[in-house]
């Protein structure tokens, strides 16, 4: 696909793909695109090019069409000598956070060398109809996860559609206000060997304009990018109900008891 757009993306895992919801206003959009390109280069990566994502807005309802963003993909080259995978994704994460803090008009759906998120204000049955990429037989992935969720605590929007970058989760997090407040309080003492000189670029961790699911996603993503394995990060943020479980192994209880001193549960019925 990119050959027809005039740029090469290189070998597998040698590039990252960003999915963007840009404003429809052409001037604002071009300024945002240029800003992202500058940030990518400043972070030591190569910006390869843009691609307008082919869509079928005619299948959407009137409200979804009225607020539909301009959807584009940006391609970023991995720095020479950098390991593929999480090391590269961590660099992309830093670039995304810098961009998000300098541009409030654009929503970065995903930016990764391993995953691409397709989502919007439509039903699951309309996903492949709206994104023609997903109808292409040459489009291959090791796994695909699909999730549908109607807004209950927040108004529906393209940005708040599911899934998010790391999680597929129904939300309904009853403890969200306390969770967010405590994450904010921890930021002054945050340290990570992976963000030794870049911690200020990724803070604040939580975008409080997002839904409860989005804010959990922010926290989980930060923990993984800071060096915690994903399964552990999930067990720390959403622990099993261990305290009163008389059948749970004592070592497992000790595990949850230990991590409960570091992170309160993001709790809810879902």
Where are the predicted features?
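Conserved short alpha-helical segments that host acidic/polar catalytic motifs at enzyme active sites
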Residues: 1-270
